[in-house]
């Protein structure tokens, strides 16, 4: 688009374009390369682009880091979102942005509201302290920042009064939790993500206190290796009193490797999320049917449920059947979740599945009663050709993903052509399907996308023409 303008009008005519037209042109360019090319076409475009550039993503190519960062801040005076990402960094690529670099950023980027620091291994608590001079900072994401401690996060909480979104991922030295207490008093956090921060456990979340009222999104994941070394220590969860957790605003809840203690702690959270729309439970120990039933009876707006269920072999210390999810949970979901669009089940170990968990009939009941658009089954050994036949009546189903579903054969796969609304099919590591099962799809124009990965009896030739777009990969190392 901008090339045509330059050719037809020349530099002089472009300089005479009304401001609103220039802004409109710039707003329609979404890639950095396009905007850079346009800004080089004339001085006016260069100047206006600098004024309108609100986001910046930088990383290994920033050398020397502090000087280059200063130059960028001066060139783009209205930056509000900055991402500094050093994924794949090596020492030969030059020094990373450090505490001095953050000082440069906070001193010269006065409109900063959203900052992401990923793999920034040179930044310490001192650098995080510089963020206190950013009064408008509302979002901070730290991904693998090993030199930052709880003291640094506390200084952030004290200095950045408008912080609404905080992500801490693999911040291994964030040990103290005074910052959680401080946020609990402020009652300002709306989105909190804590993943694989080894020193932070379920029991520490109680320190949020009244901040639970404001939270709309909580993602909390315990480091799996650290958890297993503690052998499912119940001390953390015992610190939670049996009380009502005020979490009416929570819309998204994601828990990984967590202990769900009956009647307290995160179990109270599950039972009081009446406005929840998205639930993800990944390898959470102790979740019971009563927890799910209590949740779905209140959360009538649930649209997405994802469950990764521990197997019997994975949890040798928990043999209480009452602490397992069964068809009672699926029946409750089917009865109360009239808006459910996405449902995913995954078992952690297909060779040692839970003997007391979901049955085929329970899964079929849910699919038949809920308007599910996306269904994903991973290591669900009970799902077979009868299940595929039941999907023929799933009027809303558009996306189906089967992973390690070894009981599905060509007989079931052939039925895909009869699914009323299906347009995306994904098959991975399924031993029972072959090229014969794909034949009815070839040339049928039924599917928009077909993804086949690591299915040993399906060939590239067999999937050719089976969908508008086909992705085929085969790596059979998983079988050996």
Swiss-Prot record:
Disulphide bridges in this chain? none
User: In terms of domain of life, where is this protein from?
Assistant: Eukaryota
Keyword Membrane tagged: no
Q: Where are the LRR repeats?
A: 61-86, 94-119, 120-144, 145-170, 171-196, 197-222, 229-257, 258-283, 284-309, 322-347, 355-379, 380-404, 405-429, 430-454, 455-480
Q: Where is the F-box domain?
A: 11-58
Q: Which Gene3D superfamilies match?
A: 1.20.1280.50, Ribonuclease Inhibitor (3.80.10.10)
PROSITE patterns reported in the protein's UniProt record? FBOX
Keywords recorded for this protein, A-Z: Leucine-rich repeat, Repeat
Q: What is the protein name given in its UniProt record?
A: F-box/LRR-repeat protein 14
């Amino acid at each position: 688009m901008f090339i045509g303008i330059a050719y037809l009008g020349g530099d002089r005519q472009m300089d005479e374009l009304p401001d609103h037209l220039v802004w409109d042109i710039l707003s329609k360019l979404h890639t950095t390369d396009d905007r850079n090319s346009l800004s080089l076409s004339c001085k006016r475009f260069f100047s206006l682009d600098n004024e309108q550039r609100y986001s910046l993503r930088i990383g290994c190519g920033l050398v020397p880091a502090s000087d280059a960062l200063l130059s960028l801040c001066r060139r783009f005076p209205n930056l509000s979102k900055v991402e500094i990402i050093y994924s794949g960094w090596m020492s030969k690529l030059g020094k990373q942005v450090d505490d001095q670099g953050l000082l440069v950023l906070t001193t010269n980027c006065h409109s900063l509201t959203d900052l992401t620091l990923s793999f920034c291994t040179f930044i310490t608590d001192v650098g995080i302290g510089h963020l206190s001079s950013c009064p408008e900072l509302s979002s901070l994401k730290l991904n693998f920042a090993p030199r930052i401690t709880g003291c640094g996060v506390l200084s952030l909480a004290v200095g950045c009064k408008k912080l609404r979104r905080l992500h801490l991922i693999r911040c291994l030295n964030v040990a103290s939790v005074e910052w959680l207490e401080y946020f609990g008093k402020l009652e300002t956090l709306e989105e909190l993500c804590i993943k694989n921060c080894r020193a932070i456990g379920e029991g520490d979340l109680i320190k949020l206190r009244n901040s639970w009222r404001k939270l709309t999104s909580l993602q909390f994941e315990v480091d799996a290796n650290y958890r297993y070394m503690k052998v499912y220590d119940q001390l953390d969860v015992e610190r939670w009193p049996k009380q009502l957790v005020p979490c009416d605003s929570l819309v998204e809840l994601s828990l990984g490797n967590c202990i769900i203690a009956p009647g307290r702690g995160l179990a109270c959270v599950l039972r009081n999320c009446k406005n929840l729309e998205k639930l993800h439970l990944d390898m959470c120990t102790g979740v019971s049917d009563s927890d799910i039933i209590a949740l779905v009876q209140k959360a009538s707006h649930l649209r997405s449920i994802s469950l990764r269920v521990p197997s019997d072999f994975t949890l040798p210390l928990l043999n209480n059947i009452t602490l397992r999810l069964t068809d009672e949970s699926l029946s409750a979901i089917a009865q109360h979740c009239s808006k459910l669009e996405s449902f995913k089940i995954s078992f952690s170990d297909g060779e040692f599945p839970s003997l007391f968990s979901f049955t085929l009939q329970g899964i079929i009941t849910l699919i038949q009663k809920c308007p599910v658009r996306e269904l994903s089954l991973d290591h669900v050994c009970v799902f077979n050709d009868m299940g595929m036949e039941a999907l023929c009546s799933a009027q809303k189903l558009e996306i189906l993903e089967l992973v390690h579903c070894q009981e599905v054969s060509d007989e079931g796969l052939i039925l895909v052509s009869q699914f009323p609304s299906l347009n995306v099919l994904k098959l991975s590591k399924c031993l029972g399907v072959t090229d014969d099962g794909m034949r009815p799809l070839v040339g049928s124009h039924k599917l928009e996308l077909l993804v086949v990965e690591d299915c040993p009896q399906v060939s590239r030739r067999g999937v050719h023409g089976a969908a508008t777009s086909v992705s085929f990969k085969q790596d059979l190392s998983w079988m050996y």
